[in-house]
Structure formats: structure tokens, C-alpha cells
Amino acid sequence: MKNRFLLLFALAGMLLGACGDPLEVGTDPVPEPEIDPEIIEPFAARNEAIHDGRHATAYVTYYGSLIPDAYIVTHINYAFAELYMVDGVYQGFKLQGKTARFESIVALKQSNPDLKICLSFTHGVANSDNKQGGSFSALCKSEDNMRRFAEDCLAFLVKYGIDGIDLDWEFPGLSWSGAACDPAVDVDNYVLLVKQLRETLGDDYEISYAGYCTDKVAVTGGYRYIDIKGMDPYVDYVNIMTYDLDEAPHHHSALSDPRAYKDCARAVQAYLDAGVAANKLVLGIPFYGRHSWSQSPTAITYKSILALDRYKYRRNQWDEQAQCPYVETMGGAFFCGYDNPRSIAAKGAWARQKGMLGLMYWEYDQDDANGTLRKAVWNAVMQ
């Protein structure tokens, strides 16, 4: 087990991976293309997915520029909305960025009515008129706050005709950059929040949360960060952030690798051990590579990996044990682990064998221009 210093870096890495566009490095003007995978015939596959509930979920950000292909996703989680709190009193929530961006995503339901769109809430602050980060902690200290938040969520879902709420509180009881938190009560209060959401939204809308990978039972017997067992009765599924689990020279999203601090298999097993059914678990796929948590570049989008200077880096090196590719320098040093169609296929097959619900990815715009990874996720889920 690595020390607390590494754990804090791991948490910081998850925050970068889950809530922001990773840094890019210098690029070759003519990137070497990936082989564009043939996509499984979408309509028949989608009909089958609808009947058995499989998930191919894309996180789509407010700062992205692309409009997703509505026929190679089953779910879109729109990132993000943020909470407004003043002196401990809930004031409401707002979308981050421009409303027009969100509305353009919602409009995709006109071409594919089966598409599910959920609004994802962040603990962070991006809007210039909002001053308090970490507002989940303050929100959850008042039953009235939580009730009014849930009512606002319901009104928003009805207004836009979308399908659910996704919560991305990273993480209860932990402070980032001075964000409000209360380690004594945040974990338990998070359960109360999803309970209130379920009571208000009923069974007509989906509720999910972004699951932390290294949560475990603390020495006191309680849970640190997220009480995954306590949350389970109130959520439809968990989007497990199986990425940013280590840094170079290890893989950050290995399928199974005892050399890494954590891997996908161990993260999923923690949820199964807590009593969460496999068919409520969605495996996370990063569309970026992780180099470091503290040194530049910290992370590199997939499209930038393809554009790395081929005279300085070798990509598509394969690690059989981790079932993931990596980039190495021409001197043979491990630069970053990442995912490609081969590793996504392996993860999809593993998830199906475990009886999991499907795959999700962060995030749509980090793929290459051909949509190589998006198509690979769709194919892996629809096999």
C-alpha cells in the first residue's frame, strides 16, 4: 500500500481527469491516424440495447465544441451544472457555460428519442457569478436545502424533457482548494441527498453518481468519501471513474495490474463486495493518457497522443498484463498509459463477463476526428 501522499495525488488526478480537459503537449502537424474501426450496425444493436438496458455513456462538457453522434451512445451526461449557496442557504443551480450548448445536446432527442440525457452536477465552480466551491457539503446540512434542490431538479427535468440526474461530488469529506467540506458528516449526508432526490423524482427519472475507485471501509468501520452501500438503494447505477488510478511508469486505467496503485478489476470488486449488483455498475474509460499528477504534462488527450512527435515517442506499445497500450520515449522510458480500441474491446468483454451494465467515457471531445474511441466503446458494449 502506498502512503497518504500518493493517495492525495491520486485524488487530485481523478479531479483533473473527471472535471477538466487534460493538458496537451506539442504535436506533430501530421498525426499518424488510427485504424477506423467498423461500427456495428447501429439500429439493430441499439434496439437490442434498449431491451436489455446496456449503457454506452458519453460525458459531454459545456466547454466542448462537438455535437455528439446520437447513434453511437445510449446516454449523454451533460457536464456540468453547479450549485449556488450563500451563507449556508441554497439559492439554486445553473448550467456552466452557455445554455445554447446544453440545448443543442437536448435537441439530439428529436433525432433519437431513445437517447437518454442526464444533467451532471459538479462540486466545482466555473461561472463567474458563483463564489463558493464545494457547495454540496453546505447543501446537505439542511433538509430544506436538499428538498428545494430536488424540487429544482425535477422542474428542470420536466422543462427540458430529459431523463435524470448524475452527481459528481469529488469528494465528500475532502476539500479541494478551500472548497467547503465537513469530514464528520459529508459521507452520511450524501446518502441523505440521493434519498431526497429519489423521493422527489420517483421512479420516472434516473439517478446516478460518479463513483470513486479507491473508496474502502475506514478503520472506524464507516466509509471514507462515499458510502457505496448506503447509496445503493436510491440510485439506478454507478459510473465508476476507473481512471487516474496511478501515474507513469504505471498505467492509470489498467484492466488488471498488481503493479499499479489501483486497477479496474479491484475498483469494481470493491463495489461488488459492498453488495452493489454488477448490473448497476458502469465501467469508466478515459479518452486521455495520464503522465503525472504533479509534473507537466499531467495528462494528454487521445487526439494529442496520436499527434505526438513520432521521432520522440512510440505509441501503441502493448502491456499484456495490464491489457492497455502505452507511449514510451525513444529512449524506452514509459511516458503515459492510455486506452485504444484494443484495450476498450478487452474492457468491454471483461465487463460483459462480469454482468456489468456497460461502459462510460470522459469525455467526448478528447477523441480523434474519426471518433475511433467512441465507436470502439459502442462496439464493445453492443457485442
Predicted stretch roles:
Residues 15-18:
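C-terminal motif of bacterial Sec signal peptides marking the signal peptidase cleavage site
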Residues 20-23:
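Bacterial signal peptide processing site
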Residues 32-157, 256-261:
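Glycan-recognition patch characteristic of GH18 chitinases/ENGases
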Residues 46-51, 102-118, 122-125, 191-207, ...:
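Surface-exposed amphipathic alpha-helices with a cationic face
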